[in-house]
């Protein structure tokens, strides 16, 4: 497979030092061991067993890894010893763990400086060497890997390459002769398999980094030495402040949880590792469902309590059945209390991408969202279990301190490697367990598939009553809370810093909000009106507001474009205070020596500027009357900022309907204290995590109300526009009617006084008429701008709703398409199975008829044999009977040969060359086959 470079273009070189550099990605030695185990587990090898052991060869301590998988050819071995070649694919639902084509190189070179690989695949045998020592001795500038290939007759293939590679291997490896290499190939059990030997292990203080002495059936990481306190247990870097689980320093414990559903036996130093079905070995097991927005399908999460050690808890995160992160603490487990102690969560994150060493995930947005969701789900499980157990056993120990047993007992068959569920109470199991030992007769045969799991990926397996109770309590408490909050919100004084009003140029610009948001805030506060309360004394520069104007001017926090995800910015510097005078303040009963000042305020709403003029309003009294006048002036300055002369639009107080329409159509900005109080309300609301759904539903309802109200305003705007057009038309008609035209091409004159008298019924001055006409034009322009603003809000609202509905429809379409695909696949498989069953039925009927025929022939032969035996006694027919017996024996032998060939089609393991047709062996085999066929047909 050595690629030749294009002419004139150089290949990228790989320095031998990269072997060590590449291995440094494994900061923990067991992650390097896991890479070699993964290579045996992957579907292209599909090993049933792997043996890991420590041995000594030529005074070198070595680690050996031997599996009984499919083995490799010399070309495939070359790819394995090269970098980045990974052609692993899923086979029969078995998903490969390997992704990058780098696991063997990084793992083996992390454990030791030199590695040799022996492999055979039934047709050929190969030996390959990956050695840093060899490359240093020959001073190689590129990584070279000697490979020797043998055929099944132990003869070398490709003599030119193999001789040079053989010489290099014999000189720089632990095996000095060809016979020793072949002996290692013979050490591989069976016709296929692979054996890896690693030596020159990484050492620390003249000793290897592994402890082989403390447990003769385990490989452990030595305990850390502390000169002051003495020995202390080994801890991974990320667990320096936690209790380290045994899997951190024991290879046997780590291998037992390495795979979510183990399909391969691991024999460590001669003793089988008792692998765990992690998701089944917990207590109080419940399942929850995670629905990420970035994924079209749901993800199952399993929660339970650790039965062995409550101090080992957290999330077990798997990827393609392989453990990536163990005991990752999330949610309430991160707090400095006993919440979440003992709870273990299990999730298979196939939608995340693992890092280079398969010990962590890439820190992406998807990973962060997943960790957050896991924390919320774990909090729900913890609260539910806490409430449930305290309710059932109020005087008992805390749930984390109760002695627990796994909810179920599962064991793996040593023959077929299938997992079987056992009845409760079966703790003592033999060293080797087979399906035939199963008490359940339904799963007593290795041919029977495993017990199917619950495939419900839509609903959790438990009801979150604690969450619902909190939600109901908050719903009951909310009506009592909102009036109190609104009262504080409307009458709470806010101190303003005086430097911000030193110059008109330093005034903070007003905030522009969408009309839909402001109308929602106005309605929300109007729904919870409270009677006015006495305002406490304060040095605030703001004037008192009437209850109605305060409610109208209050502003809710900013909402996102979809009205779902709310964001509040507390430290906002671009807020100012604007008081909009819509109603005349009644004249106080007692006259005060206070200057009265008319106010004019500007409201900018989405690019539309609207002006209002209110009547004079007296400043409210505070505790000190001496400073009331100055306080009033400052309050006016704070409210109106700068007095800008502008066109005055006079409001007709007599037309109440028009005033109400204007008050509702124009959305008013809010005060600073209103926004601050809304933020406090939101913080109070956010204490309950479940309130998000209710708030979302409320926002959707408010959105519908906004849309309806907007349509109403639009209709009213159109109505007023039509009325104004009618008035304009009447004015034009009056002009045409009462205009005197001169025939001498002089200017046309209009009797304005007569025109006004005709329209209004009374005499009006021309100046007043012009002002009213200008006012009408301004009113038309304002209504047009309001109309355009409302149309803009409607477009935004419709776009938000369309986006929501579109995303939901897309998600439903994807799920429905997946269901239809699965249904089609199931129907195709069902048809295939039907056809196979029909063929088997036909074959069975044919075999049954043939067996019946053979039975009758055998009975006939037996009867003829008995008759001939009785006739032998007569001396007169001795020669004839002998000849007859010879002929019958020949017939019987030929019949047995035919029966044997037929049985070979039914029983493939039957070796006809070892069958003696002169005895009744074939008859016994035929009888057994007939009995089995009858049992099968009866079942």
Curated annotation (Swiss-Prot):
Modified how: Sumoylation is involved in interaction with PML and localization to PML nuclear bodies.
Region of interest (Nuclear matrix binding), residue spans: 326-353
Covalent crosslink: Glycyl lysine isopeptide (Lys-Gly) (interchain with G-Cter in SUMO1): 597, 650-651, 740, 794
Summary of the tissues where the protein is detected: Expressed in heart, placenta, skeletal muscle, brain, pancreas, lung, liver, but not kidney.
InterPro entries the record matches: HATPase_C_sf, MORC_ATPase, Morc_S5, Znf_CW
Pfam families tied to this protein: HATPase_c_3, Morc6_S5, zf-CW
Domain remark text: The CW-TYPE zinc finger mediates its binding to trimethylated histone H3K4me3.
Name of the protein in question: MORC family CW-type zinc finger protein 3
């Amino acid at each position: 497979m050595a690629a030749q470079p294009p002419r004139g273009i150089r290949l990228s070189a790989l320095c031998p030092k990269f072997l060590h550099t590449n291995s440094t990605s494994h900061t923990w030695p067991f992650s390097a061991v896991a890479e070699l185990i993964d290579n045996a587990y992957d579907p292209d090898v599909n090993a049933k067993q792997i043996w890991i052991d420590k041995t000594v060869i030529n005074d070198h301590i070595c680690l050996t890894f031997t599996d009984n998988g499919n083995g490799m050819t010399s070309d495939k071995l070359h790819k394995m010893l090269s970098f980045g070649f990974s052609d692993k694919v899923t086979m029969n639902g078995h998903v490969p763990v390997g992704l990058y084509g780098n696991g063997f190189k990084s793992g083996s070179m992390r454990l030791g400086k030199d590695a040799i690989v022996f492999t055979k695949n039934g047709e050929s045998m190969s030996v390959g060497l990956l050695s840093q020592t060899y490359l240093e001795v020959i001073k190689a500038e590129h990584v070279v890997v000697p490979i020797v290939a043998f055929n099944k007759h132990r003869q070398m293939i490709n003599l030119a390459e193999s001789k040079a590679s053989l010489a290099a291997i014999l000189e720089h490896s632990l095996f000095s002769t060809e016979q020793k290499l072949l002996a290692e190939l013979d050490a591989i059990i069976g016709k296929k398999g692979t054996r890896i030997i690693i030596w020159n292990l990484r050492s620390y203080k003249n000793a290897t980094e592994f402890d082989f002495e403390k447990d003769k059936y385990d490989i452990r990481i030595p305990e850390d030495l502390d000169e002051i306190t003495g020995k202390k247990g080994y801890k991974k870097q990320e667990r320096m402040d936690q209790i380290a689980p045994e899997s951190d320093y024991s290879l046997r414990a780590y291998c037992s949880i390495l795979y979510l559903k183990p399909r391969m036996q691991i024999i460590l130093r001669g003793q089988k590792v008792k692998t765990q079905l992690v998701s089944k070995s917990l207590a109080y097991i419940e399942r929850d469902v995670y629905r990420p927005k970035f994924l079209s399908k749901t993800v199952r999460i399993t929660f339970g309590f650790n039965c062995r050690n409550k101090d080992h808890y957290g999330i077990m995160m798997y990827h393609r059945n392989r453990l990536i992160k163990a005991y990752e603490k999330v949610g309430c487990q991160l707090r400095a209390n006993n919440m979440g102690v003992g709870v273990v969560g299990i999730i298979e994150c196939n939608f995340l991408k693992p890092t280079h060493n398969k010990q962590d995930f890439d820190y992406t947005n998807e990973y962060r969202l997943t960790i957050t969701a896991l924390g919320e789900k774990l909090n729900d499980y913890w609260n539910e279990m806490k409430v449930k157990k305290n309710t059932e056993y109020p005087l008992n120990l805390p749930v984390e301190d109760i002695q627990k047993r796994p909810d179920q007992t599962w064991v793996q068959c040593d023959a077929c490697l299938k997992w079987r569920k056992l009845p409760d109470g079966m703790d003592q199991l033999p060293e080797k367990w087979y399906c035939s030992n199963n008490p359940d007769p339904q799963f007593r045969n290795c041919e029977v598939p495993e017990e199917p799991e619950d495939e419900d990926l839509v609903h959790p397996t438990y009801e979150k009553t604690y969450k619902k109770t909190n939600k109901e309590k908050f719903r009951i408490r909310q009506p009592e809370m909102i009036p109190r909050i609104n009262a504080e919100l409307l009458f709470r004084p806010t101190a303003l810093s005086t430097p911000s009003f030193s110059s008109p140029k330093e005034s903070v610009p007003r905030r522009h909000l969408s009309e839909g948001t402001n109308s929602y805030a106005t309605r929300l506060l109007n729904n919870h009106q409270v009677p006015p309360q006495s305002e406490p004394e304060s040095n605030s520069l703001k004037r008192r507001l009437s209850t109605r104007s305060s409610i109208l001017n209050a502003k809710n926090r900013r909402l996102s474009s979809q009205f779902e995800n709310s964001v509040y910015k507390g430290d906002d510097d671009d807020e100012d205070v604007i008081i909009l005078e819509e109603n005349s303040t009644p004249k106080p009963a007692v006259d005060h020596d206070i200057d009265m000042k008319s106010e004019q305020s500007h409201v900018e709403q989405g690019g539309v500027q609207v002006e209002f003029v209110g009547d004079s309003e007296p400043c409210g009294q505070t505790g000190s009357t001496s400073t009331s006048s100055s306080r009033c002036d400052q309050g006016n300055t704070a409210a109106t900022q700068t007095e800008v002369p502008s066109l005055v639009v006079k409001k007709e107080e007599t037309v109440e309907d028009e005033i109400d329409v204007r008050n509702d159509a124009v959305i008013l900005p809010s005060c600073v204290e209103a926004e601050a109080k809304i933020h406090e309300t939101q913080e109070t609301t956010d204490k309950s995590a479940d309130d998000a759904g209710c708030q979302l539903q409320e926002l959707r309802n408010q959105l519908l109300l906004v849309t309806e109200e907007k349509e109403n305003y639009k209709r009213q705007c159109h109505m007023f526009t039509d009325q104004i057009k009618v008035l304009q038309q009447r004015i034009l008609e009056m002009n045409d009617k009462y205009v005197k035209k001169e025939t001498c091409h002089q200017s046309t004159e209009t009797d304005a006084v007569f025109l006004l008298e005709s329209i209004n019924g009374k005499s009006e001055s021309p100046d007043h008429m012009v002002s009213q006409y200008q006012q009408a034009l301004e009113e038309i322009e304002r209504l047009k701008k309001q109309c355009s603003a409302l149309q803009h809000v409607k477009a935004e609202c419709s776009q938000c709703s369309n986006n929501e509905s579109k995303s939901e429809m897309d998600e439903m379409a994807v799920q429905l398409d997946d269901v239809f695909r699965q249904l089609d696949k199931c129907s195709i498989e069902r048809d295939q199975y039907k056809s196979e069953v029909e063929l088997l039925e036909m074959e069975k009927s044919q075999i049954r008829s043939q067996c019946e025929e053979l039975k009758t022939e055998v009975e006939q032969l037996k009867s003829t044999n008995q008759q001939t035996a009785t006739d032998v006694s007569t001396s007169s027919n001795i020669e004839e009977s002998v000849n007859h017996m010879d002929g019958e024996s020949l017939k019987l032998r030929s019949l047995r040969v035919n029966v044997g060939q037929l049985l070979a089609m039914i029983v493939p393991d039957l070796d006809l060359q070892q069958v003696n047709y002169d005895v009744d062996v074939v008859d016994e085999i035929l009888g057994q086959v007939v009995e089995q066929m009858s049992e099968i047909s009866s079942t």
